Design a protein with these regions (language model features):
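N-terminal Rossmann-like FAD-binding beta1-loop-alpha1 element of flavoenzymes
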Residues: 39-64
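Short, solvent-exposed loop/turn and secondary-structure capping segments
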Residues: 73-77, 115, 120-122, 130-134, ...
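Extreme N-terminal leader/targeting segments of oxidoreductases
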Residues: 2-39, 57-58, 544-551
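Glycine-rich loop(s) and the adjacent beta-strand/alpha-helix scaffold that form part
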Residues: 54-57, 61, 68-73, 77, ...
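Redox-cofactor-proximal catalytic regions of oxidoreductases
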Residues: 83-171, 175, 347-350, 363-364, ...
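A glycine-rich dinucleotide-binding beta-alpha-beta segment and adjacent secondary-structure elements
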Residues: 205-212, 224-231, 238, 265-268, ...
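Mid-to-C-terminal "cap/lid" subdomains and adjacent gly/pro-rich loops that border
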Residues: 257, 292-415, 548-551
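Conserved redox-cofactor binding core of oxidoreductases
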Residues: 13, 134-264, 483
Length: 551
């Protein structure tokens, strides 16, 4: 039995776990804390993990920090929902506001690889108009990057991650073929397709970051997806293409160091106002790593928390906060669902949970609300499903037991919908302290009228689709949420944004933010592909800035 990856650091003494070999190790370069590395990266998920690999491959010295453990998927992951909660960020946080956000496994990860270790692998591009949503569609804020530019980085990300997808994707501008063929649909996916066709809207196989055929690469070999169904609880075969299986091995091979179980609590600045390194807790004590540049990539809650916790005499309101926007404009995505029972068995747990998708309402503008949404087939595992029943139907005891007997006959569709930016929705610091003595995040959230209108519309459409295929005992789950964004938005004006298009702080030129917190708008699709595309662009821009002597 493998040791607990949360008990003590695994990436030490010049080696890190080789996740492609049971009990294996891979060489890892180590850097002195007293020597200033080119980049200290806080977080190793879709943003930080990608950036660590691509900067190291350009020859920069990189140390990447993660508060979570360094898991070995072949040994540490179990077919046990409760045990796999170890992958989630469940540290103390304070939530408030009119509509407090549920935090944990649905939107936070605590492991090398970040939340990509337990994400659902849905790999979608933004609708082109969303990059100029204010100018083009009349809501939100414009991105400082055009869709044409992002399309190039999306294509790179899809190739590097080895996305499995349909031969042609029916929405948006034409794009190259996905590297791997689409996954075969399970019964839940086929029923989504049937429901969409019944109400006259399109559907397709979902582009997924999990292999549909064997993959062999310099980092290691991976088999195709075994349709085990535990995607959101850690993939035991390495078929999942996460930061842990794609970017971190590349980072190590290129000379980066990864420090697991290393909680960064403060970014330090010097007399000249530039950052000088990070204070981090590891092996029972606080340490300091000098760095020429610091990249904060802790996602939409931990990124602003770190910037605010790093306040000092020169920056009393926190780092990169000259605009006063650090922590503000927090956005979540709505995750409402429709559930029903089919007479024939569905066995929706077989395979990835979202094998089929419709993006119709992202591209149809005949709506009475701003933004858009997609919906996908679902396949929750038993514990997840019991949570749905207790939450949405208020079932307990014998009523819950009886409802669970229908598990293999259930069908569900779940949306990912865009919620609009609002400065009142924010991350700030609470009075409560965590296990490191640091103020925890306070997450304040309230739904707007547009958010509610979008959810109402989606529930009507999803209900119609499963009613049309004969589902009965239909019920709604209205208030669920998922992915986060905002809180350190990028922009073209330092008065209205935290970082520029390159993810570089306007206020402190050697401080960068590279994760979903830079999103000016959150879109109506899953964010992980966009985060990785942004990281690829940022790495490219850093290389060019360095060559021009402008770092």
């Amino acid at each position: 039995m493998a040791s607990d990856p949360r008990a003590q650091p695994r990436a030490t003494r010049g080696r890190a776990p080789d996740i492609f070999r049971k009990g294996g190790w891979t060489p890892m370069r180590e850097y002195s804390e007293g020597d200033a590395v080119d980049f200290a990266i806080v977080g190793t998920g879709a943003g930080g993990g990608t950036l660590a690999a691509l900067l190291a491959e350009q020859g920069f010295s990189v140390v990447a920090f993660d508060a979570g453990g360094y898991f070995r998927p072949l040994e540490d992951f179990a077919s046990d929902e409760t045990a796999q909660n170890q992958l989630y960020w469940t540290d103390k946080r304070v939530v408030d506001g009119a509509n407090p956000i549920k935090m944990g496994g649905n939107n936070s990860g605590k492991a090398v690889g970040g939340s990509t270790v337990h994400y659902a692998m849905v790999a979608l591009r933004f609708r082109p108009e969303w990059f100029k949503s204010h100018t083009t569609l009349g809501y939100g804020a414009d991105w400082p990057i055009s869709w044409q530019e992002m399309w190039r980085y999306y294509a790179i990300a899809e190739q590097q991650i080895n996305i499995s997808g349909p031969l042609t994707y029916p929405w948006g501008p034409k794009r190259p073929r996905y590297p791997y063929r689409a996954h075969e649909l399970n019964t839940a996916g086929k029923l989504l397709a049937k429901g969409c066709e019944a109400i006259g809207i399109g559907w397709t196989e979902t582009p997924l970051a999990t292999l549909s055929a064997p993959h062999s690469g310099p980092e290691g070999n991976s088999p195709p997806c075994a349709y085990r169904g535990f995607c959101r609880f850690g993939c035991t075969t390495n078929a999942k293409r996460s930061a842990l299986t794609v970017w971190i091995p590349r980072a190590l091979a290129a000379g980066a160091e990864v420090r697991d179980l290393a909680m960064v609590g403060r970014v330090e600045t010097g007399a000249n106002g530039r950052v000088t390194g990070v204070h981090y807790h590891r092996d029972g004590g606080w340490r300091f790593q000098r760095a020429k540049n610091v990249v904060v990539a802790g996602y939409a809650v931990e990124t602003p928390r770190l910037l605010l916790n790093s306040a000092n005499q020169s920056h009393p309101d926190g780092l990169a906060n000259a605009s006063g926007l650090v922590g503000k404009n927090l956005m979540t995505q709505t995750n409402a669902a429709i559930w029903g029972r089919m007479e024939e068995p569905v066995r929706w747990y077989k395979g990835p949970p979202s094998l089929a998708i419709t993006e119709h309402w992202n591209y149809d503008d005949n709506k009475d609300f701003h933004g858009g949404y997609c919906w996908m087939g679902q396949g929750p595992l038993p514990n997840e499903w019991a949570s749905v029943l207790t939450g949405a139907r208020r079932l307990w005891g014998d009523g819950l037991r009886h409802a669970m007997l229908d598990y293999n006959h259930m069908i569900g569709v779940k949306m990912v919908g865009e919620m609009l930016p609002n400065e009142a929705n924010r991350v700030s610091l609470a009075d409560d302290l965590d296990q490191y003595g640091l103020p925890v995040a306070r997450i304040t959230y309230a739904w707007g009228e547009n958010d509610k209108a979008l959810v109402r519309h989606s529930l009507e459409q999803m209900s119609a689709s499963i009613e049309a295929i004969g589902a009965n005992d239909i019920f709604r789950q209205e208030d669920d949420t998922c992915h986060l964004g905002g809180t350190a938005r990028m922009g073209s004006d330092p008065r209205t944004s935290v970082v520029d298009a390159d993810c570089r702080s306007w206020e402190i030129p050697n401080l960068w933010v590279c994760d979903g917190s830079v999103f000016p708008t959150v879109g109506g699709v899953n964010p992980s592909l966009t985060i990785q595309a942004i990281a690829i662009r940022t790495a490219e821009r850093i290389g060019k800035l360095a060559a021009a002597g402008e770092l």
